[in-house]
Amino acid sequence: MRTHYCGHLNKSLAGQTVELCGWVNRRRDLGGLIFIDMRDREGIVQVVVDPDMADAYEVANTLRNEFCIKLTGEVRVRPESQVNKDMATGEVEILAKGLEIINRSDVLPLDFNQKNSEEQRLKYRYLDLRRPEMSDRIKLRAKASSFVRRFLDDNGFLDIETPVLTKATPEGARDYLVPSRVHKGSFYALPQSPQLFKQLLMMSGFDRYYQIVKCFRDEDLRADRQPEFTQIDIETSFMTADQVRATTEKMVREMWQELLNVDLGEFPVMPFSEAIRRFGSDKPDLRNPLELVDVADLVKDVEFKVFSGPANDEKGRVAVIRVPGGAELTRKQIDGYAEFVGIYGAKGLAWMKVNDRAAGMEGIQSPVAKFLNEDVINGILDRTQAESGDIILFGADKANIVAEALGALRLKLGKDLDITKEGTWAPLWVVDFPMFEEDDEGNLHAMHHPFTSPLGVTAEELKANPAAANSNAYDMVLNGYEVGGGSVRIHNAEMQAAVFDILGINAEEQQLKFGFLLDALKFGTPPHAGLAFGLDRLVMLLCGTENIRDVIAFPKTTAAACLLTDAPSLANPAALEELAIAVTVAKEKDAE
């Protein structure tokens, strides 16, 4: 039906007759001539309908926005004075010879010329996707996927599919369960990742695997999470962690170069402990120069228990952030930040303004200065390299609370005060994660997943002191987002059983849940390692947006609902009966 896309027309086609299909973006009637901005997925071109073309003119008179049309016309170069430099096709226009309405449109429930509510956009997503901004994002996603496949194919990786109906495994989030009609009372789980299957593929001899695959997690949502998401899943045999990182870093660097013409440069490598110490996060945004500075040794002997208590607690921490120029913050703003860190468990936010460094104690303004002697204050000022006009913000609590609260505050200050260098890129690798993390009850949990190999210890050494072990894991971080995570995997049954033991999974449960894996590890398993990228998050960054819903064609809401199709919905009672499932809905107790 068409010979060209609207957005591909240029001066080289002058004099040629073209056939276009698309939508009416705008129609204008100017002194007899009718102008139509015609749009398709590749862009917009201006169409001129002259009254001399009687049939086309008659049709053009009836056109309204979003009518689907077919046009036959001649490409002609615009006069220099009429060139539209804001349009890719602005040097040409189409003189209409034939015009056909393929389909009419009702009045749209969305207004493409103003901001629509997200609820309306998701309910009428098929219309929202017509907007050039959204269309460009989906096209960039397609280019990113195509690039990944091409890169991995060229590097000897095999695209292999893994099952979608599988078995539940403990990977940190709740599973989406699918009832079996044949095996009544039993359930499949939709995969949170293809983790075990890709490891089994390594045991099968396919030493370089990849898959762009849908994964599912029934977890609380936020701007960069969805219940179903797309993963670039990669696994290799006989490659070290350094080699896996080098290969995947090359892929991301070349992707940014091809799609954005941006050179990310070589990625720095930072241990987990340094990331937490300096930035309060294992995914630090290095565009933000603010850092956490430890001062526990300076305040451990003060009488102010708010500081000295955590400073003398082996699980406590006292740290500060120096904010250049922050002395201009008002008390109301500081109180707002104190309320903000409270979200993360902090009990308050002590502060110290350095109004005049040269004036000594007279130049300090702080509600806690009276509890600190001059040597302590000078020590803090020297360590943070504070200058006149700065403010110092304190965190004193359990180490994890200080890291989380000040880490989040650091990001907020970066945005609020324009400290973060927007429009730049700051990638890095974070490595040497703890093997396990402890919950409030003192139980150990795998920090990544239970198939991650420990770093440099035997199974016996790991069991003797699991809390001290690091894992051979690595995360790729870009502008404060974890875009990919991976590890060297456990490749012998003894080590895998040891990890399960530490996690409190007894021998019987190991066989029930992971017997197939433990058996497979007995048959000459090669050393293997891998990594998985979140495609949605990568594309979100490529597009310069902050919400992955902007780069998914048909996303869910933060309540995991599809407003377009009204999913999830109640099941047919007959289908439930066939599945031998009875549904009970828990009701909240009436307020007393």
Curated annotation (Swiss-Prot):
Residue sites binding ATP per the record: R217, D218, E219, Q226, E482, G534, L535, D536, R537
Pfam families (UniProt xref): GAD, tRNA-synt_2, tRNA_anti-codon
Coiled-coil blocks: none
HAMAP family the record matches: Asp_tRNA_synth_type1 (MF_00044)
Localization (cell): Cytoplasm
GO molecular function: aspartate-tRNA ligase activity; ATP binding; nucleic acid binding
Family the UniProt entry places it in: Belongs to the class-II aminoacyl-tRNA synthetase family. Type 1 subfamily.
Region: Aspartate, residue numbers: 195-198
Keyword Cytoplasm in record: yes
Name of the protein: Aspartate--tRNA ligase
Subunit: Homodimer.
Enzyme class: ligase
Primary location group: cytoplasm
InterPro entries for this protein: Aa-tRNA-synt_II, aa-tRNA-synth_II, aa-tRNA-synth_II/BPL/LPL, Asp-tRNA-ligase_1, Asp-tRNA-ligase_1_N, Asp/Asn-tRNA-synth_IIb, AspRS_core, GAD-like_sf
Catalytic activity: tRNA(Asp) + L-aspartate + ATP = L-aspartyl-tRNA(Asp) + AMP + diphosphate
GO BP terms: aspartyl-tRNA aminoacylation
This protein's record includes keyword Transferase: no
Superkingdom per UniProt: Bacteria
GO CC annotations, alphabetized: cytoplasm
The protein's Enzyme Commission number: 6.1.1.12
Alphabetical UniProt keywords: Aminoacyl-tRNA synthetase, ATP-binding, Cytoplasm, Ligase, Nucleotide-binding, Protein biosynthesis
Function: Catalyzes the attachment of L-aspartate to tRNA(Asp) in a two-step reaction: L-aspartate is first activated by ATP to form Asp-AMP and then transferred to the acceptor end of tRNA(Asp).
